């Protein structure tokens, strides 16, 4: 469409349209005009502005009822014209303002007209566009006293729409239009900024509307949350911009005491406000009520954008109205301080920025500095804090502690001065100690034991997470919300950062010593104080550098560390199962859990576990105290960084003691603490940490083993070291191992459990450090031999006499071994092998070469285990059997040492297998499997004579029971024993290369379990037995399976000269063995 740039061309196009609209006011004529206007340039429209507006205004002013659609079209067309032009005449601006405002009012009913939402929205947008189109100085002349009635009329209409309208779009548009009418909008279309005089005149004018605006907006803001966050945000913005402008201290200081009389009608003059001192005080008091209502409601609003706008609300009022709104300063500061720890990062960041700005500008409220008000507020809060922590719910505690944290952040370095007051420190510490009281009645903590040593080993690589943030989850008596605990940690860190650390540490150390009731809480606080003093992860809005040097901090940490690891605070009784010697030692030394009788741990009967008792509570308390102290050591390392290496000699040994503690929680926390130390001190892993400090650790263990009655935890340290070190540690610990074995020989009746755990850790480490490199080759060789057995015997004709001779000699040797003639084994090997040729100058050694260190250790340990395998304590027997299995794994490459020891261990092992507790039978059977895979020929005759008959008899006896049993049977010990035997028999038959008779016994015992009446897991285990039997004797296995179930009635011979084969097996598909037999036969093919 062509664009008409000149007024003449535009007039020629628009004249007939305007004339037609003036004559006939219809929607079509208005839309026709708007269509033509889109083809006119802005310059031409500006020249023809009043000509174009005339028919539109005429249509609005025509008396009589009008269709809403027509009025809406006229307002939209008028808005289009105003958006493209400027209003340059004051009279035109006032008239258009009145005409648009009248569209929203019904003169007949004397209240806002009941219009469609579309028309209301169009009129609101038209008013906003009109005010933006006013030309420069014209807008200022509009705001004169004579306009007060019309302006007040528009303001009341817009407030009514914002409060009562249901449409969210209209509500927001009305609030934005109100902001424009008050000259407080944020857009760039407004004229130049107002000078001081203009601001004062406009403030005097708008002050008349302040009561109505503040009242209506407060109702909107504190309304239902369901109205939507955007409405609350817009209402807050209008409120603080209006109040911040009218009540601005900068304006009010220039207001003269006497009011100049305006040249206006008496009716209008009565509406004028003189903002003198009394009015300011009265209005400030009334606004304080509204502001408190708004703060109480909005500070807990669920939407973060509303809380973010509240921060802007507080900032504007605190920066502009500190003198006029003195009564509101406290609540405003309180909400700002509370929101500094908001869950929304956007709110937190903005709040911190505002706090920093307030601190930098040194805002004065009334005649007092902001810091004085904050100090007074902190004092008041500290006074009521113990009561609030005792009476509030979790949300209340969170809000109160957020407030406390905010005060500390805002006061910053001045906290140091405040904490010089003994009363302040006592109130704060009493509240913190009270709220941090732990719940220690949980029986589960005492029951959770570290039954095996696997929990001792930490991960090889150090986690990348911040160490001190991984605090063990704990439960408190006063709250359950985890956010409250996080706030308490931040508060303690800020106290350590800004306060006098010497004073605070002395105070909480005194509480630590005063009573066992305070000890755990005081330790938690001390840990966080040290982290805060280091300035790590502390949000400092004052940019204060830590005043404490690393040497001073290290000395403080050293003193706390010494207190934590002292005898009376480190060696607390945490379980019922304290060994006798340790218990006696504790009583002799006086190292009870606490000095008072409440937490003295006594050995009680197990029925006491049925309900929480004071004894259980005391042990739980001890567990938590040790865990908190361990976490504290990790936090100290985090605070000191690599400087903590200077304290490792006094810290690492006690931590390793707790890493081997039988209480699961303590063991886990100790291991986690070692990971924290690795973070701080630059070690790659816990293994690296222990290797680098192993010399003094081993020295300490060696010394303490010689005085075991005074140092009963020395074996635990060695156990933890072995779990977390590598083979480079072996030369250092070789002598210590001999000390352990010698001490075990001396105290086996009292301390066998501790030492057997150490031996288990030692052998597990040796098996890991020195794996059998030849095992893979042996497996490959075995598979090749199996393939060779399955090949056709085509090459057997070429067998030589030498081969036959070698076969006979090997057979005789294996027969001797199977019959137990072990002592002659070495002599036979010397006879059969020709002596090597040596040089005449060389001399033959008179003695055998020394064994490798790990082989000698394994040999010595296995000798002790043979004696301990008959111990009366079941737990010790189980652990000894585990150690025996590990010894066999380590010694498998040295048969000359392994076989004699296996010979000596065999009688005890048979007794465990046949006449012991079912748990011991299970464990002994695992040892038997290990022996079978490492020394098969040696074990063959013994196994067949001493063990196999009882195993097969047991399987046959239990088969009917398991076939009839229900699903609960799979949880019984009898089932687990059946399953273990079935799973292990197959490999044993193959490894021991049993003869046909013994294989038949195994097959007869296991064939019952191929029935589908047996539990599924037992069927699977039985199938695994027959899969192994197929490898040893496939023909017999094939025949046995077909006797159970025959898929075909008659086998056709592969050659005509052979007769067909008829088997006796059942052929019915309902046969209970059919499924498993078919599965096995398929595998055999």
Curated annotation (Swiss-Prot):
Keywords: Cytoplasm, Phosphoprotein, Ubl conjugation. The keyword Ubl conjugation applies. It holds the Pfam family TPR_TTI1_C. Residues 777-799, 822-847 are annotated as: Disordered. One of its GO terms (cellular component) is cytoplasm. InterPro entries: ARM-like, ARM-type_fold, TELO2-interacting_protein_1, Tti1, TTI1_rpt. Phosphorylated at Ser-823 by CK2 following growth factor deprivation, leading to its subsequent ubiquitination by the SCF(FBXO9) complex. Phosphorylation by CK2 only takes place when TELO2 is bound to mTORC1, not mTORC2; leading to selective ubiquitination of mTORC1-associated protein. Ubiquitinated by the SCF(FBXO9) complex following phosphorylation by CK2 in response to growth factor deprivation, leading to its degradation by the proteasome. Only mTORC1-associated protein is ubiquitinated and degraded, leading to selective inactivation of mTORC1 to restrain cell growth and protein translation, while mTORC2 is activated due to the relief of feedback inhibition by mTORC1. Transmembrane segments: none annotated. One of its GO terms (biological process) is positive regulation of DNA damage checkpoint. Regulator of the DNA damage response (DDR). Part of the TTT complex that is required to stabilize protein levels of the phosphatidylinositol 3-kinase-related protein kinase (PIKK) family proteins. The TTT complex is involved in the cellular resistance to DNA damage stresses, like ionizing radiation (IR), ultraviolet (UV) and mitomycin C (MMC). Together with the TTT complex and HSP90 may participate in the proper folding of newly synthesized PIKKs. Belongs to the tti1 family. This is TELO2-interacting protein 1 homolog.
């Amino acid at each position: 469409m062509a664009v008409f740039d000149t007024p003449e061309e535009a007039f020629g196009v628009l004249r007939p349209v305007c004339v037609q609209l003036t004559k006939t006011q219809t929607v079509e004529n208005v839309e026709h005009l708007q269509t033509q206007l889109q083809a006119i340039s802005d310059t031409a429209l500006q020249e023809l502005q009043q000509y174009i507006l005339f028919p539109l205004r005429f249509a609005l002013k025509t008396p009589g009822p009008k269709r809403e659609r027509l009025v809406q079209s006229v307002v939209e067309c008028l808005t289009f014209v105003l958006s493209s032009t400027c209003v340059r005449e004051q009279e035109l601006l006032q008239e258009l303002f009145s005409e648009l405002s009248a569209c929203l009012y019904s003169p007949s009913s004397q209240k806002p007209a009941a219009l469609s939402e579309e028309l209301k929205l169009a009129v609101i947008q038209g008013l906003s566009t009109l005010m933006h189109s006013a030309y420069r100085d014209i807008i200022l002349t509009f705001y004169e006293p004579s306009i007060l009635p019309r302006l007040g009329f528009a303001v009341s209409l817009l407030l009514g729409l914002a409060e009562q309208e249901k449409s969210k779009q209209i509500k927001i548009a009305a609030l934005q239009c109100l902001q424009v009418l008050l000259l407080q909008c944020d857009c760039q279309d407004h004229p130049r900024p107002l000078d001081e005089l203009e601001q004062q005149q406009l403030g005097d004018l708008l002050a008349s509307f302040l009561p109505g605006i503040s009242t209506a907006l407060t109702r909107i803001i504190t309304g239902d949350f369901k109205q939507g966050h955007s409405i609350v945000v817009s209402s807050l913005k209008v409120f603080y911009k209006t109040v911040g402008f009218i009540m601005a201290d900068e304006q009010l200081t220039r207001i003269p005491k006497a009011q100049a009389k305006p040249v206006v009608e008496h009716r209008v003059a009565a509406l004028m406000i003189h903002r003198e001192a009394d009015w300011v005080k009265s209005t400030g008091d009334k606004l304080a009520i509204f502001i408190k209502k708004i703060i109480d409601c909005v500070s807990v609003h669920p939407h973060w954008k509303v809380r973010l706008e509240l921060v802007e609300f507080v900032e504007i009022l605190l920066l502009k109205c500190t003198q006029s709104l003195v009564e509101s300063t406290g609540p405003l500061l309180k909400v700002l301080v509370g929101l500094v720890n908001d869950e929304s990062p956007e709110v937190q960041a903005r709040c911190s920025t505002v706090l920093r700005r307030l601190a930098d500008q040194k805002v004065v409220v009334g005649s007092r500095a902001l810091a004085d008000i904050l100090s007074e507020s902190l004092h008041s809060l500290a006074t009521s804090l113990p009561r609030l922590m005792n009476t509030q719910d979790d949300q209340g505690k969170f809000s109160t502690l957020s407030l406390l944290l905010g005060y500390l952040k805002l006061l910053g370095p001045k906290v140091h001065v405040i904490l010089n007051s003994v009363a302040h420190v006592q109130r704060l510490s009493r509240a913190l100690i009270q709220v941090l009281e732990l719940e220690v009645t949980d029986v589960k903590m005492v029951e959770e034991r570290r039954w095996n040593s696997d929990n001792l080993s930490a991960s090889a690589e150090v986690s990348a997470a911040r160490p001190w943030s991984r605090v063990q989850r704990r439960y408190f008596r006063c709250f359950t919300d985890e956010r409250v605990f996080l706030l308490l940690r931040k508060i303690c860190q800020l106290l350590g950062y800004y306060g006098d650390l010497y004073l605070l540490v002395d105070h909480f150390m005194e509480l630590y010593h005063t009573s066992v009731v305070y000890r755990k809480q005081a330790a938690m606080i001390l840990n966080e104080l040290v982290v805060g003093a280091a300035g790590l992860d502390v949000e400092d809005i004052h940019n204060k550098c830590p005043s404490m040097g690393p040497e001073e901090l290290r000395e403080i940490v050293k003193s706390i560390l010494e207190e934590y690891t002292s005898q009376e605070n480190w060696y607390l009784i945490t379980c019922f199962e304290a060994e006798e010697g340790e218990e006696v030692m504790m009583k002799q030394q006086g190292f009870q859990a606490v000095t008072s009788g409440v937490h003295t741990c006594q050995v009680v009967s197990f029925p006491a576990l049925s309900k929480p008792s004071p004894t259980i509570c005391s042990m739980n308390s001890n567990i938590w105290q040790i865990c908190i102290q361990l976490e504290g050591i990790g936090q100290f390392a985090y605070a000191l960084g690599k400087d903590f290496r200077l304290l490792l000699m006094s810290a690492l040994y006690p931590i390793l003691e707790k890493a081997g503690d039988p209480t699961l929680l303590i063991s886990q926390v100790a291991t986690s603490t070692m990971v924290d130390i690795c973070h701080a001190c630059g070690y790659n892993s816990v293994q690296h940490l222990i290797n680098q400090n192993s010399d003094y650790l081993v020295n300490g263990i060696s010394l303490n083993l010689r005085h075991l009655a005074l140092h009963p935890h020395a074996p635990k340290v060695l156990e933890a070291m072995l779990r977390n070190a590598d083979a480079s540690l072996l030369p250092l610990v070789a002598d210590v191992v001999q000390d352990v074995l010698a001490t075990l020989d001396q105290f086996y009746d009292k301390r066998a459990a501790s030492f057997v755990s150490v031996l288990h850790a030692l052998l597990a480490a040796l098996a890991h450090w020195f794996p059998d490199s030849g095992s893979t080759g042996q497996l490959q060789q075995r598979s090749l031999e199996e393939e060779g057995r399955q090949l056709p015997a085509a090459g057997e004709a070429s067998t030589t006499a030498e081969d036959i001779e070698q076969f006979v000699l090997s057979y005789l040797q294996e027969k001797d071994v199977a019959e137990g003639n072990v002592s002659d084994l070495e002599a036979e090997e010397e006879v059969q092998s020709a002596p090597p040729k040596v040089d005449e100058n060389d001399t033959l050694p008179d003695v055998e070469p020394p064994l490798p260190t790990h082989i000698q250790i394994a040999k010595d340990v296995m000798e002790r285990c043979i004696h301990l395998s008959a111990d009366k304590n079941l737990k010790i027997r189980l652990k000894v059997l585990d150690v025996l299995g590990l010894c066999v794994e380590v010694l498998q490459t040295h048969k000359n040492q392994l076989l004699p020891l296996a010979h000596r261990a065999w009688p005890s092992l048979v007794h465990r297998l046949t006449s012991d507790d079912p748990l011991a039978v299970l464990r002994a059977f695992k040892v038997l499997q290990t022996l079978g895979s490492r020394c098969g020929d040696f074990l063959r005759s013994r196994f067949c004579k001493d063990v196999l008959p009882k195993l097969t008899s047991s399987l046959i006896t239990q088969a009917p029971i398991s076939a009839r049993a229900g699903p609960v049977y799979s949880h019984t010990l009898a089932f687990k024993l059946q399953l273990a035997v079935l799973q292990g028999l197959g490999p044993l038959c193959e490894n021991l290369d049993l003869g046909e008779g013994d294989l038949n016994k195994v097959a007869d015992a296991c064939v019952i379990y191929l029935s589908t009446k047996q539990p599924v897991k037992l069927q699977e285990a039985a199938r695994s037995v027959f899969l192994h039997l197929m490898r040893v004797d496939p023909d017999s296995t094939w025949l046995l399976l077909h006797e159970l179930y025959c898929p075909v009635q008659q086998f056709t011979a592969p050659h005509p000269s052979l007769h067909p084969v008829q088997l006796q097996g059942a052929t019915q598909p309902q046969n209970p063995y059919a499924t498993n037999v078919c599965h096995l036969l398929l595998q055999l093919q």
